[in-house]
Swiss-Prot record:
GO molecular function, one term: 3-dehydroquinate dehydratase activity
EC code(s) of this entry: 4.2.1.10
Protein name: 3-dehydroquinate dehydratase
Organism: Shewanella halifaxensis (strain HAW-EB4)
Residues flagged as site, Transition state stabilizer: 21
Pathway(s) served: Metabolic intermediate biosynthesis; chorismate biosynthesis; chorismate from D-erythrose 4-phosphate and phosphoenolpyruvate: step 3/7
Gene Ontology biological-process entries: amino acid biosynthetic process; aromatic amino acid family biosynthetic process; chorismate biosynthetic process; quinate catabolic process
Entry similarity comment: Belongs to the type-II 3-dehydroquinase family.
Residues forming the catalytic site: 26, 101
Gene3D superfamilies in UniProt: Dehydroquinase, class II
Amino acid sequence: MSSQPKILLVNGPNLNLLGRREPGHYGHHTLEQIVDDLKQSATQAGIQLDHIQSNAEHLLIEAIHNSDADMVIINPAAFTHTSVALRDALLGVAIPFIEVHLSNVHSREPFRHHSYFSDKAIGVICGLGAQGYQFALQAAIARIHAAEKQG
């Protein structure tokens, strides 16, 4: 583990449009608001939170490859249903991860029901809007603190 525990937050394509893109599915919070709230919560817990959002798959993969995080929180967005490469990046670095989705992907179009990540994630949170990120952060912090006590 790094000297200060670290979480990498990864947000996939189109999440830069949060707050104005289909608010019925994704809510009214902007990505900036979500990330700012998460950083504040992480700092209070003594955790460094690094963030990347990109519409480019290769940039997300490189961020994962280059990370020394203890945990990853990922909203792969549309890559959820298509990206073996992003899945392989997470498996390749062997950093535990939590998958998050703002909307309930299981109540939407059938193509959104399959995830290339869920079977490898330590947990999946979907349908709870921006609050789902906070739940994922709290779970990640708890796992990091438990690992610190053990080792």
